[in-house]
């Protein structure tokens, strides 16, 4: 463990503190033009890396076809990159989709706070 915490705290796996799920982009190739150009924000790993705390700026959007092969995540979801820019984090400020190169974490408020998890990963 990198840091000492109060002895009453217990080390937990992330999935014990909330929901952990992988982003979704089923269609191959992922860059198929017919998936893009709609109203649904699609966050890439570079967007997450560029965000300071909250993620609301995006470089691409999905249309209905793109959304159908993906998943929308709610604001407050912690995005953690697992490819290209590894372990970069940002909290969704708006609804949006992200590819399978990103993990989404939704904190159980009775167990932890998404900001704490973000800052712990970022340390």
Regions found by a protein language model. Give the residues of each.
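DNA target-recognition patches
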Residues: 15-18, 29-64
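Basic, amphipathic alpha-helical recognition segments used for DNA target recognition
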Residues: 13-19, 49-55, 72-75, 91-97, ...
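Non-catalytic DNA-recognition/assembly elements of restriction-modification systems
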Residues: 1-25
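Short glycine-rich, flexible loops that bind phosphorylated cofactors or substrates
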Residues: 88
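A generic structural signal for residues embedded in beta-strands
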Residues: 80-81
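Short, well-ordered loop/turn elements at secondary-structure boundaries
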Residues: 36-38, 73-76
């Amino acid at each position: 463990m990198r840091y000492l915490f109060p002895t009453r705290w217990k080390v937990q796996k992330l999935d014990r503190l909330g929901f952990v799920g992988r982003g979704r982009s089923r269609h191959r190739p992922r860059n198929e033009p017919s998936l893009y150009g709609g109203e649904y924000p699609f966050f890439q790993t570079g967007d997450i890396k560029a965000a300071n705390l909250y993620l609301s700026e995006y470089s691409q959007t999905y249309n209905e076809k793109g959304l159908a092969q993906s998943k929308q995540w709610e604001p407050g979801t912690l995005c953690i990159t697992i490819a290209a820019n590894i372990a970069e984090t940002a909290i969704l400020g708006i609804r949006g989709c992200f590819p399978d190169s990103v993990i989404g974490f939704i904190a159980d408020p009775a167990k932890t706070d998404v900001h704490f998890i973000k800052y712990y990963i970022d340390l």
